[in-house]
């Protein structure tokens, strides 16, 4: 998800998105550990998405 799209969301929606992304990352890590994950690039993408969401959340909290 792009940062511009994330900035349009409110803090509650960002929190929900963060929870979904963390859950997806957990599932991907489990699949990777059991050698069932074919698209290993998704791990990196989801990690970066989580970082983007957290960054936008922090920006919004500081803005007020």
UniProtKB/Swiss-Prot annotation:
Homology family: Belongs to the universal ribosomal protein uL29 family.
Matches recorded under PANTHER family: 60S RIBOSOMAL PROTEIN L35/50S RIBOSOMAL PROTEIN L29, LARGE RIBOSOMAL SUBUNIT PROTEIN UL29C
Highest rank taxon of the organism: Bacteria
Any one biological process term the GO annotation gives: translation
Annotated organism of origin: Solidesulfovibrio magneticus (strain ATCC 700980 / DSM 13731 / RS-1) (Desulfovibrio magneticus)
The protein, known as: Large ribosomal subunit protein uL29
Gene name, Swiss-Prot/TrEMBL: rpmC
Keyword field: Ribonucleoprotein, Ribosomal protein
A GO cellular component entry from the record: cytosolic large ribosomal subunit
């Amino acid at each position: 998800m792009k940062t511009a799209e994330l900035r349009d969301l409110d803090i509650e929606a960002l929190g929900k998105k963060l929870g979904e992304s963390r859950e997806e990352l957990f599932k991907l890590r489990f699949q990777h550990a059991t050698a069932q994950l074919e698209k290993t690039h998704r791990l990196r993408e989801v990690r970066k998405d989580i970082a983007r969401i957290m960054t936008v959340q922090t920006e919004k909290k500081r803005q007020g």
